[in-house]
Each structure stands twice: as structure tokens, then as C-alpha cells.
Amino acid sequence: VWACPWAGLGRAHAEGLVHGTPAARLAAATHCVTCHALPDPRHLDRPTWTNELLPKMRVMVGLEPPTTEAGFRDIDLLRAGKAFPEKPLMTRAAFDLAASWFVDNAPDSLASIQEPGRIRVELAGFDVVALKERHDPPLTTLARIDAAGRRVFLGDVGFQGYNVLGPGLDIREGNKLGNIPVALDVDGADDWVACIGHFFPREEPRGQVLRMRRRPDGSYGRIDVASGLPRLSDIRVADLNGDGVRDFALCVYGNFIGRFSWWEGKGNDRWDEHVLLDKPGAVRCVPVDFNRDGKLDLLVLVAQWTESLFLFEGDARGGFTRRTLFQKPPSWGHSGMDVADFNGDGWPDVVVANGDNADFPTSPPRPHHGVRLYLNRGGARVEEAWFGPMNGAYRLAARDFDMDGDLDIAATSFFPDYERSPREGFLLFTNAGGKERWDFQMATFRQSVAGRWLAMDAGDVDGDGDEDIVLGSLVRMPTAVPSKLKEQWEKQGPSMVLLRNRAR
């Protein structure tokens, strides 16, 4: 008998709703939570529930066959991966009853959550430097700062590789990979690169892990570490079992099929994979001693319908115990994460972005999108301490950008409300409240609409002691953008912008 591989994860998140019959509410609470947390009907408008989401759910519960017309691709691979049940998980009557609860409680429309007047259009203390050379059109998937080497990495869909830039955004090298780089971790002379394979959602396994080794003469040697993987999203290199050999943690985001795993280095360019989470949607991972026991843990943010933050507590010998720090409804759209001690208590805290809004061609703004700060309370517990609304929040970095002794947050939005608040494509949340009171003021730079910022990183690229920011623009997506803005991006938008910090 087919069973949902994510059974038991669900929790109710939709309280206080009065429309619909008790039987409809019970049907939704009974059936939906076998695979994910109970969705909140208010997170999507009624047309999206009716025309987009519920028809797809009929397929996912086995009441309708998957078709390309319904938005499914690589159907044979999905069936082989058991993405669909062999038998219906519920009757049509039960589905229709549960569906009525979502439709009855959904709003007719959703409003933007950002107030345009609250964003200060002046980024004090930063100079804006655009990369003079550009990929035409800009399709940047990787923006990474190597502070130790004073280098910037720029990956692009069309280039199928990455460029190495100097601190002034001068192009020094180019590495063609034959694949799309989306994440890179530097380990000595090695650039560990995660390649997604397909930028848009597919099941065809074309993901790769490459180790690019810099030779003394400036050339690169390439080692194909792993291939034939679902779509990758992040890679982090560390010694995870204490044997002195480099391992790496890998986010295999996939689409319907994916996983999170760590790869054990065996020497002689060999690695063994250990799967820690057999679910798609792993977005970001951070190796960190989160529980302060002196052993390295893995903090993993998972999107898709799981929408959870997991802590894998390490034993320093390669063993990991999974803890769920939180789980949100499947419409949450987790997209970015950083780890830093915000309140100065010695415990690493987590700042998270949720704003992925590419599920449907006409995805409306979502009232729950934004940036959230979770304080580490020990005992595998986190507490939400602050929420900053931000349409389409995507990538972020926590640093003391103004060097006043507390942490600020830089964040991009890949899905801003272009009609009401187009400048929220990049926001700097400057902390004016210190380490005990969260008072973040929003600002952006005047040229913030010059690109659609998918990629971001922060680090001291010029070696002057303060934190700079790089933004990478990807201008082609099937979601709605004003035609004038899109034309501007295509013709003259930069591939990358450096926000050079002048705090020192």
C-alpha cells in the first residue's frame, strides 16, 4: 500500500476561520496533514485555490492522472520515483468536502504587504559599482564572495560556468562547466561547485558536484565528484566525522524528487553519500555547532511542501540525529537562511527568508512573506523574535554592516510587488535597537530596480575591514513583470552589482 513518505509531519496552522462546515474543516485537517502542515486558506486568493492549486492536488492524491496540461513534466520519472500514489488516498467526496473549506475561507484577492513609503531610497555608507561587462541577457545564478582571496564569483545560465572577479569587479578568469552553477564553497585551493542541471523545475537528474582546483600557474583542474543528481541548491564543505578528510553537505532540492545528504570523504577522490532527509526542497544548509556541545551540527532549511527548519545534531563521528525546529504551511515558500548570534548570548540564531512565489503563472502577493529572526533557546528550540514583511523575500545575509556593534540584515526579493513596491528588490534592514530590542529600518539604493536580484552574498571583498554586498541579476522568469522594466533589464541591466561598504 502506498503511503505518503512525509506522513506525520503535519500540524495545524489555520486557526480562527469560521466559514465552511465543521465537516469540511475536519476533512481538511484529517487528510491534508498526512503529507504536510495544514494550509491556511488565507495564504492564497480564491482564484488561485480554485484554478491552480486544488486541480494539482487532485493529481497528488491519486484522483486524476498526471498530465502535461496539468503542469506536470517528466511524468515517467515521477512515477518511477513514486511521487504519485498507486491508489487514491481519499474519495472524491472527501476531497471535494476538504476543498470547500479552503475555497470558502480564501479571500477574493490579496494585497501587497509592503508600504512603499517606509523604504528609504538612500543607502548611506555604500557606493554602487556595476559590473561593466555583462552576460547578455543577465541570467546570474551565483554571486559569491571569497573574502580571504579577495575574489567574487559570478555564475550564469547562458555562460554555463562561472567567472572569477577581482575586488573591483574586474573579470580575471572564466571557468566553463557545461552546467549551471548555483552554489560554491571555497576550501583552500579548491572551489567546490554545485550545479543545478535544470534551472526551471524538472526531474531529469543533471545536477553535478565539481571540485575546481587552482594550480600555481592560474589554471584549473576539474574533478567530477558526483553527477546524475536532481537539481542542486547548496553545498558546504567541512570535516563532518572528525577523520581529517574533507566531507561536504549537499542540498538536493530537486522538484518532486530530492534529498539532503552528507558525503563522506574516503580519500583518493572518493566519497560515500549518507542520506539524512529523503525529501525534496532542501534550500540552504549551514554546518554550525548549534547546540553548543562542541560538535558540528547541520542546520537545514527545507522548502516545497515540507517548509521546515531541521537541525541534524552531529556526534563528531558521522552520526546525526534529526530535530524539527519549526514547520510551516506548504504555501510558506522558504528561500534563504543565515546564521549569526543576534542577541549576544553566545548561541547561534537563525534568520530566514520566505518569499518563493513561482508556483503559479499568476501567483498573487502573499501576506506571510518576509524575513524572520529566530532566537536559539537551546534544547533544539527556536523562538520567533521579529518579522519584517517583504514581498517575495529570497536571499539574505546577517552582518554588522554599519559597524555599530549589532547585526543588520541584507535581503533580496526575487518576487517584489512591481506595481506597488518595486524597490523592495533589495532591502537593507539596519538594526537601530541593539541586541535586545529589534528595530530594523529599511533602505535601498536608487538603482535597485536595475536588475532582478536572484543571487546575493556579503563579505569583505576589498580587505578594508567592513562587509560589502554583491547582487546577481536573473531577468527571465515566467512570472509577471512590467514590460518597460523587463525591456530595460534585457537591454542594459547589469549581471552583477557591488555595494561597496564605506564604514571603514
Language model segments and positions:
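Accessible peptide chain termini
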Residues: 1-3, 216
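Boundary at the C-terminal end of the N-terminal hydrophobic targeting segment
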Residues: 3, 10-14
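Secreted/luminal cysteine- and crosslink-motif detector
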Residues: 3-5, 36
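Beta-propeller-forming repeat regions
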Residues: 17-21, 25, 31-504
